[in-house]
A protein has these predicted regions:
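GG-anchored amphipathic helix commonly corresponding to the ABC/SMC/Rad50 NBD signature/C-loop
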Residues: 67, 190-215, 228
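H-loop/switch region of ABC-family ATPase nucleotide-binding domains
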Residues: 248-250
């Protein structure tokens, strides 16, 4: 997939007309352990929640899912009556949010569950007997895209959608690949990152169009290289299929891809509770994650007096610039 097509995907995520179902606001009131002023506002097809471990990112995602879905499949510690969600459809407020289609995904958890189930099964061939591999996902273009994401060349990839084997209402992909030298193997022999990337690729194409997708810690087991290409692909499919994505992440690569404008910083102070802010400068969320932002450049001055003058002026008028440059 060409880089220009990737970049167009990111541009299109900014065009809200591409999304029929938009998660625009989440407010939480009078909930124990949550700030009284908690209000998460979103205005892009892909947004990211960032913050240190244990501050409440997963709690927020699970609360959103449970509030819309109301099926009890995802454990949630907040009282749903304290949560107010605003969805928009074609620029109009959705009156019954329970009609929206929402999916919650912890990729590493799902993949581990699937592989563990397959390893414990006596005859795996029984699961895929009579099932034809997906013609769409097995196209040459998609094989090339998956290869770019993972950093490996494949000559053939087969996705078998197995339904009702692991659970009554559960579908997962059993995947077989062939390399250019003729070597064949399945998801049981894949590295965790390889199967995880293919699983996310399958999932984003399997779920309904014009739905909401909540992804918790997408970067687990995935290399920095693959994170970059995977996010580009998600942006492309998100804008093409109208899938509104909110994810949580600690990854500098993913935060940089999504951009500071679409990042929301989650914190949890003992006397305040879970809070959310929209950082205006990248150093605020990088520092909150324990990541030291790279300097953008260097100012060269003539002498110490010039250095002191410039430093004082920047600290007074533009502290962010002073922080960004040596």
């Amino acid at each position: 997939m060409r880089q220009a097509k990737f970049n167009d995907g990111w541009r299109r995520t900014q065009e809200l007309s591409n999304y029929n179902c938009q998660l625009r606001q989440v407010s939480i009131n009078d909930a124990k352990g949550v700030s009284d002023k908690f209000c998460l506002e979103l205005d892009n097809g892909i947004s990211v929640l960032c913050g240190k471990n244990g501050v409440g990112k997963s709690t927020i995602l699970k609360s959103i899912y449970s509030c819309i879905k109301k099926n009890g499949l995802v454990n949630n510690r907040l009282n749903l009556s304290d949560i107010n969600i605003s969805l928009k459809n074609n620029n109009h407020e959705v009156q019954d949010i329970n009609n929206a289609v929402v999916n919650y995904l912890e990729p590493s958890v799902e993949c581990n569950k699937i592989i563990r189930f397959l390893n414990d099964s006596d005859n795996i061939n029984d699961f895929i007997e009579g099932i034809e591999p997906s013609g769409f996902l097995g196209k040459k273009e998609n094989i090339a895209i998956i290869g770019n994401i993972i950093g490996r060349v494949y000559s053939k990839i087969e996705f078998y959608e197995v339904e009702g084997a692991l659970d009554d209402d559960y579908t997962f992909p059993f995947i077989k690949v062939t390399l250019p030298d003729g070597v064949e193997y399945s998801c049981l022999e894949m590295g965790s990152g390889e199967y995880l990337c293919m699983y996310i690729f399958w999932f984003i194409n399997w779920i309904e169009k014009n739905s909401i997708l909540l992804i918790d810690e997408i970067e687990n087991c995935i290399s920095v290289y693959s994170q970059e290409y995977l996010m580009d692909y998600l942006a492309h499919v998100s804008s093409q299929r109208g899938i509104w994505i909110l994810l949580s992440s600690h990854s500098e690569t993913i935060l940089s891809k999504v951009g500071i404008k679409n990042a929301r910083l989650i914190s949890n102070v003992s006397n305040v509770g879970i809070s959310v802010v929209s950082p205006k400068h990248e150093r605020k969320y990088f520092t909150a994650l324990g990541i030291k932002p790279r300097k953008k450049g260097i100012f060269i001055v003539e002498d110490k007096f010039s250095y002191m003058f410039l430093k004082g002026m920047l600290n007074r008028a533009a502290s962010d610039i002073a922080y960004d440059y040596h």
